[in-house]
Swiss-Prot record:
EC number(s) stated in the UniProt entry for this protein: 2.5.1.-
Species of provenance: Streptomyces avermitilis (strain ATCC 31267 / DSM 46492 / JCM 5070 / NBRC 14893 / NCIMB 12804 / NRRL 8165 / MA-4680)
Domain of life the protein comes from: Bacteria
GO molecular function: ditrans,polycis-polyprenyl diphosphate synthase [(2E,6E)-farnesyl diphosphate specific] activity; magnesium ion binding; Z-farnesyl diphosphate synthase activity
Protein name per the record: Isoprenyl transferase 1
Cofactor(s) it depends on: Mg(2+)
Amino acid sequence: MNLRDNLRRLLVRFYARRVEGHLDHDQVPKHIGVIMDGNRRWAKAAGSTTAQGHRAGADKIEEFLGWCSETDVGVVTLWLLSTDNFDRPQEELGPLLGIIEGVVRTLAADGRWRVHHVGTPDILPSQMQNALKEAEETTAHVDGILVNVAIGYGGRQEIADAVRSMLLDAHEKGTSIPDLADAVDVDLIGKHLYTGAQPDPDLVIRTSGEQRLSGFMLWQTAHSEYYFCEVFWPAFRKVDFLRALRDYAARHRRYGN
């Protein structure tokens, strides 16, 4: 590393400390959703393999959660694997599933995070299902950030699953269709989402410069603020995170008004 690179790093750290020093913790989002995009493009730019890109992205997660802890964020939802990702070639999907399983086990073993799976478990390999179940059980009483790991997740599928869950629940209780129709409202459907009684995301961050949600938490993000960052996920820095928080704090949330 040359002198110019060292100087640049020092300036970035100084700037990050300055931004953090001006943050009002009362204005920090309580729930942040993250679309971690750009692993493959980062790998291509770095001359690395796709698997190495996914590994670099996985390695960024604990660092990111550490930043969230430092700024008093309470809930983080990480989109690790969408339902559409299962259409990728097996030579990419296989290693990716292994990397994601490793992330789940690492988060559980860390002891700082409470892990909760959001997604359709039935489409996941049995080994992944077991890892998620074990992670939820072993971290259930952890007093730390609630980390939703969105694996095998699709926004439309979540809503379909919520409606199915609501219908099955009504059937088990002997509720008639007319009575259920009278009872259905947004709160009832919300209780059957993967996130249940959790607060909706205040802020959604998407890396890599793409400006779309791709179906991420369609129901819960109705009033969320969005922050699109040009940086690929493996290269996402603390200063990028702090800029997102600063941008969020400067906005006036209208909640549809």
